[in-house]
Amino acid sequence: MLDVLGKDLKVLFVGINPSLRSAAVGHNFARPGNRFYPALYAAGFTPRLFKPEEDRDLPNYGVGITNFAARPTRAADELSRAELVAGARVLDTLVTNLEPRLVAVLGLGAYKLALGRPKAAMGLQPETIGGRPVWILPNPSGLNAHYKPADFARLYGEVRTYAEGL
């Protein structure tokens, strides 16, 4: 429902699932306090700070968005493991067809559950999705207080630099 896709993507960002706010307005990362768009801008993916309602323009900058699960929830922990695993299978096919340079998963816990990789850590993964490299980033939700804006800027910047080198 909220996929933002295109050809020649540098990075396909994979969220866990839409928030209730995102589902209501029809745009990704729309919940107030979400740090996705500030992180994209700070990392140099976009030339200015985008608003959620501009998400459909992101493929013009090599950025795509999808989610493991399409079902909106108040919190990601309301999803079942089965929903995440099913979403990972769909994601594999999507990535195979789109061939983005890099897949960036937004959330370590969701990645571990969806892909059955309990020992995964942040950063570049030894496994691929759809034959493409995978990088795990912290989830930009405002509920994730472990990371500050400067952390997101640095980590998303590492992803941009890596993807541009592929």
What is each of the regions a protein language model found here?
Residues L2-K10, P32, A39, A75-L91, ...:
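C-terminal capping/extension of enzyme domains
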Residues N60-K119:
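Internal catalytic-core helix/loop-beta-alpha segment
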Residues V25-A82:
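Short, surface-exposed acidic-centric catalytic microdomains
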Residues H27, A110, S141-N144:
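Short histidine/acidic/glycine/proline-rich micro-motifs that form metal-
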Residues P18-S19, A30:
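Compositionally biased, charged N-terminal/linker segments
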Residues L9, L20-A24:
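Short N-terminal binding/cap micro-motifs at the start of the first secondary-structure element
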Residues M1-G6, L49-L58, L94:
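Short amphipathic alpha-helices and their capping/turn segments at secondary-structure boundaries
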